[in-house]
Amino acid sequence: MDLKKYIRDVKNFPKPGILFKDISPLLADGEALNYTITSMAEVAKDVDVIVGPDARGFLFGTPTAAVLKKPFIMVRKPGKLPGKVISREYDLEYGNNILQIQADFIKKGQTVAIVDDVLATGGTIKAIIKLLKEQGAIIKKVIILLELTDLNGRDSINEDGIEIVSLVKF
């Protein structure tokens, strides 16, 4: 299935000069959504845990984990997860941010696939990789719906042994 047909361009969103890749048409089409989740699950079938960042990583990571009957671990911004959390600060284009996971869900030696909607600069994924490695996880795969190749995110997260799979590249 050609998933590019289900991703539309929106000019000047979220601000002037930006060409936004809108995945809403894909989410609104049951067959395209099913194909996406099935494809992601096929790639992730040999890992122990699926991890995804808030918010759109949840849209693809949770159903991927459910199809595989594997746990899904949320990565969120501060103050969104109860209990003991592990934090990692990371740089953005203009400033920085913090990501957190709950401390008791990742076990040392577990293999992980990170699932998200878009790979742009790679900053978020790189921070998640560091956060998970600090917990002793083995990151095997990064599975992305849409990769913006001009932004070189793949290069910024390319580490030994991590397979990066994008279903669509622009």
Curated annotation (Swiss-Prot):
Pathway: Purine metabolism; AMP biosynthesis via salvage pathway; AMP from adenine: step 1/1
EC number: 2.4.2.7
Gene Ontology cellular component annotations, sorted alphabetically: cytoplasm
Top-level taxon of origin: Bacteria
Pfam families per record: Pribosyltran
Transmembrane segments: none
Record GO biological process: adenine salvage; AMP salvage; purine ribonucleoside salvage
Keyword Zinc attributed: no
GO molecular function: adenine binding; adenine phosphoribosyltransferase activity; AMP binding
CDD domains linked: PRTases_typeI
Primary location class: cytoplasm
Keyword Plastid appears in the UniProt entry: no
UniProt entry keywords in alphabetical sequence: Cytoplasm, Glycosyltransferase, Purine salvage, Transferase
Subcellular location: Cytoplasm
Enzyme class, first EC level, given as a word: transferase
Catalysis performed (reactions): AMP + diphosphate = 5-phospho-alpha-D-ribose 1-diphosphate + adenine
PANTHER family, per database record: ADENINE PHOSPHORIBOSYLTRANSFERASE
Subunit structure: Homodimer.
Annotated family: Belongs to the purine/pyrimidine phosphoribosyltransferase family.
Function: Catalyzes a salvage reaction resulting in the formation of AMP, that is energically less costly than de novo synthesis.
Record-linked HAMAP family: Aden_phosphoribosyltr
Stated name of the protein: Adenine phosphoribosyltransferase
Classification lineage: Bacteria, Bacillati, Mycoplasmatota, Mycoplasmoidales, Metamycoplasmataceae
